[in-house]
Amino acid sequence: MKTLLDVHTHTIASGHAYSSLQEMTMAAKEKGLEILGITEHGPHIPGTCDPIYFRNLHCVPRQLYGIRLMLGAELNILNTQGDIDLDEDYWRMLDIRIAGIHSLCWQGGTREENTQGVINAMLNPFVQIISHPGDGTAELDFEALMKVSKETHTLLEINNHSMAPIRHKTVAAPNNLELLELAKKYKTPVIFGSDAHFSTMIADYSNIMPLVEKAEFPEELVLNYQPEKFMAYLKPTPEK
């Protein structure tokens, strides 16, 4: 099936990415996408944008070059309590809200404590996707996460960039294979994320596809192929 969306990407606003918003959107158009998510890093990542960046996102059109833009953030899960950065006022300004563990701003603990921290973030009604849970930054109980994913409609991401050889994350591929096998077992949708930091990386899932084949993962559980199903599955922004 054809990939029609990628909702985990970064522009120069994140401080360590190298393409503009317009360059990213044009690349998405060239690749035939319908939906592009641009999710700049939350404020605990050094060098990322100031919170005022998110406050002013209303200036950007949500249809550009024929692409639906979803402008949001990759928020940071900060600790084993599941606290994330920014706050509710900002979360409400975002079209899409991803949360993930990053070593630069994560205070972890045991496997059980780490898992509970991610689960607490998943129980946050604003968090729609957990980014790169399989990258090995924190030891996690993937089966426990998958059960909560199914219960809460908080998608677990299969992250392409974390498996790039240059990243030297040796556990990422086996961890992501386990996530796919569990998603298949529990019939739970997943989302593929390029985690693109440059325009040519958009919708690059080349490190994911061998795992998909190995797991014999059903296409109907991959929301990147089904934009309408993806939009319907996402947690809505809670009412005030």
Question: Which stretches of residues belong to each language-model region?
Answer:
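Short acidic/polar active-site loop segments enriched in Thr and Asp
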Residues: 34-35, 39, 128
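His/Asp/Glu-enriched short active-site or ligand-binding loop at hydrolase and phosphoryl-transfer sites
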Residues: 155-168
